[in-house]
Amino acid sequence: MDVLIESTRDFEQDLEQFSNTEKFKIIKKLNSYVELLSIDKNLFYKHSAQLRNIRLKENYDSSIYSLRINENLRIILTIDDDPIFERTVITLFRAVKAKDAAKAYNSVAETLYQDFTIENQEIEVPTC
């Protein structure tokens, strides 16, 4: 299955805060995770976490994850399988400091799921 990566304006603005060298390292690490996703999704998910238990209407599952890039950086993204076009779509929403990941995650979740959420409950997730 092909993987399509999309990024939001917020993600692009977050990246601008980094030097070119740091950006290169971030993108390189992200690409290694994308490759891992296409080979073995379970291994990919070991490097990511859902920071909030989000129950959606109609038995939909939340697709938001916090991906550990390094000790201090997380990328907030969604991973959606598109069976019609036989691809996985990754949307990059934010690149934030680890300490700000929960806040960014919640903000993205509230924006994406405002009309679909039936119950929100924050959960404690160990750092991945």
Stretches found by the model and what they are:
Residues L30, V34, S38-K41, I69-E71, ...:
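Generic secondary-structure microfeatures
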Residues Y65-C128:
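Enriched for short, Lys/Arg-rich terminal
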